[in-house]
Amino acid sequence: MEKLTLPAPAKLNLWLHITGRRADGYHELETVFQFLDHGDELSFSLREDGVIRLHSEIADVPHDSNLIVRAARKLQEQSGTRLGADIWLHKVLPMGGGIGGGSSDAATTLLALAHLWQLDWNEDRLAALGLALGADVPVFVRGHAAFAQGVGEQLTPVDPAEPWYVVLVPQVSVSTAEIFSHPELTRDSLPLKMRPVPEGNSRNDCQPAVEQRYPEVRNALISLGKFTEARMTGTGSCVFGAFPSKAEADRVLALLSETQTGFVAKGSNVSMLHRKLQSLIKKSSS
């Protein structure tokens, strides 16, 4: 049977402010999400027997705990479909990197299976289901750069500049739960009242706690900071900096390659997943 193959793009938090902590322990955030033209790739094939089978194992992640499998089963359960799927994952994005690998895989799974199973589900419904899997899943479902509030699920589309980025990948996996429970984490940034959202005078409130705990992240920030403003994305560990051209970004990554691992990618306000889905829809309707 023919496979449906779709990307699961990375994201950056261009900045991230923590404005409070809720009674349930979750943190209130303000952040800007932007996508990268770089990510994992998933392939899907229809099954008639209702079985969900992920054929790509990830070290230390049991099959049934994988967000891809959980997303597929949740959609299956809530839609009432009797169909299943075989799923293959080509993993590129690091785990614990702050660039959305697991959340992006889950969102691609929801959108792909809604298409494959011919469900009449709109983005709102898929995003609401995605939120139950993780706070970052809705932005990947919607596929447009966004100013996010709440726990990250209240999304307002924005269109920041789309530069080339150098993304450094320190060889550590940062625990989001550990960072959000850090006693010295800033939790009282003032909510922004200006619109559009200012790009200057911003920061990542998680960065100091991560730098303190993970010297590899601090070293990456120092290395990239010699060439441009360097910032951490999410709760780390990945670090990024913007450049006006691919040539300049490639040059800087080459200079850093002896001590740092990373990649170069274009920023994008419309995710490559949504661009691919739109082209599929156009083909099927023509």
Curated annotation (Swiss-Prot):
ATP binds at P94, M95, G96, G97, G98, I99, G100, G101, G102, S103, S104. It catalyses: 4-CDP-2-C-methyl-D-erythritol + ATP = 4-CDP-2-C-methyl-D-erythritol 2-phosphate + ADP + H(+). InterPro entries: GHMP_kinase_C_dom (IPR013750), GHMP_kinase_C_sf (IPR036554), GHMP_kinase_N_dom (IPR006204), IspE (IPR004424), Ribosomal_Su5_D2-typ_SF (IPR020568), Ribsml_uS5_D2-typ_fold_subgr (IPR014721). GO terms for molecular function: 4-(cytidine 5'-diphospho)-2-C-methyl-D-erythritol kinase activity; ATP binding. The active site is at K11, D136. Pfam families: GHMP_kinases_C, GHMP_kinases_N. Keywords: ATP-binding, Isoprene biosynthesis, Kinase, Nucleotide-binding, Transferase. Its EC number is 2.7.1.148. It is an enzyme of class 2 (transferase). One of its GO terms (biological process) is isopentenyl diphosphate biosynthetic process, methylerythritol 4-phosphate pathway. Pathway: Isoprenoid biosynthesis; isopentenyl diphosphate biosynthesis via DXP pathway; isopentenyl diphosphate from 1-deoxy-D-xylulose 5-phosphate: step 3/6. Belongs to the GHMP kinase family. IspE subfamily. NCBIfam families: ispE (TIGR00154). Catalyzes the phosphorylation of the position 2 hydroxy group of 4-diphosphocytidyl-2C-methyl-D-erythritol. This is 4-diphosphocytidyl-2-C-methyl-D-erythritol kinase. It comes from Pseudomonas entomophila (strain L48). The lineage of its organism: Bacteria, Pseudomonadati, Pseudomonadota, Gammaproteobacteria, Pseudomonadales. The gene is ispE.
